[in-house]
């Protein structure tokens, strides 16, 4: 909306919002729900864990789905994709660095309408 490229007529098919967030729980790379450590103690200093996440502002920016998709031939919607990053976590009573799932982008998913 207020991004400079919008002045050039360029628009994203899916609007996203990015922010630094904290987490209390997450899904690890094995699919387990783990507790994310709020504070990390390294060299007698306490650090807070932050994660940079990108999420969809709206799963349907247009009534027909993603912006700019021909809705007469395609069904579409916006959804988040993710990646794995390391975080200090607890599973049971064991603390360790694990890869956890973080939302990193908002993308458009399309499927061809049947009968066209």
Curated annotation (Swiss-Prot):
Annotated PROSITE patterns: NGF_1, NGF_2
Coiled-coil regions, chain positions: none
UniProt keywords, alphabetically: Disulfide bond, Growth factor, Lipid-binding, Metalloenzyme inhibitor, Metalloprotease inhibitor, Protease inhibitor, Secreted, Toxin
Superkingdom of source: Eukaryota
Disulfide bond residue pairs: 14-78, 56-106, 66-108
Short name of any one Pfam family annotated for the protein: NGF
Tissue: Expressed by the venom gland.
Function (record text): Nerve growth factor is important for the development and maintenance of the sympathetic and sensory nervous systems. It stimulates division and differentiation of sympathetic and embryonic sensory neurons as well as basal forebrain cholinergic neurons in the brain. Its relevance in the snake venom is not clear. However, it has been shown to inhibit metalloproteinase-dependent proteolysis of platelet glycoprotein Ib alpha, suggesting a metalloproteinase inhibition to prevent metalloprotease autodigestion and/or protection against prey proteases.
Family affiliation: Belongs to the NGF-beta family.
Name of the molecule in the record: Venom nerve growth factor
UniProt organism field: Naja naja (Indian cobra)
């Amino acid at each position: 909306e207020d991004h400079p490229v919008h002045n050039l007529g360029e628009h994203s098919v899916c609007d996203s919002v990015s922010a630094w967030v904290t987490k209390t729980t997450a899904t690890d790379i094995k699919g387990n729900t783990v507790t994310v450590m709020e504070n990390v103690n390294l060299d007698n200093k306490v650090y807070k864990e932050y994660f940079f996440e990108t999420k969809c502002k709206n799963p349907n920016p247009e009534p027909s789905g993603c912006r700019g998709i021909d809705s007469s031939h395609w069904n579409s919607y916006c959804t988040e994709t993710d990646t794995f990053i390391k975080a200090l976590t607890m599973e049971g009573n064991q603390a360790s660095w694990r890869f956890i799932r973080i939302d990193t982008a908002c993308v458009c998913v399309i499927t061809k309408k049947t009968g066209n």
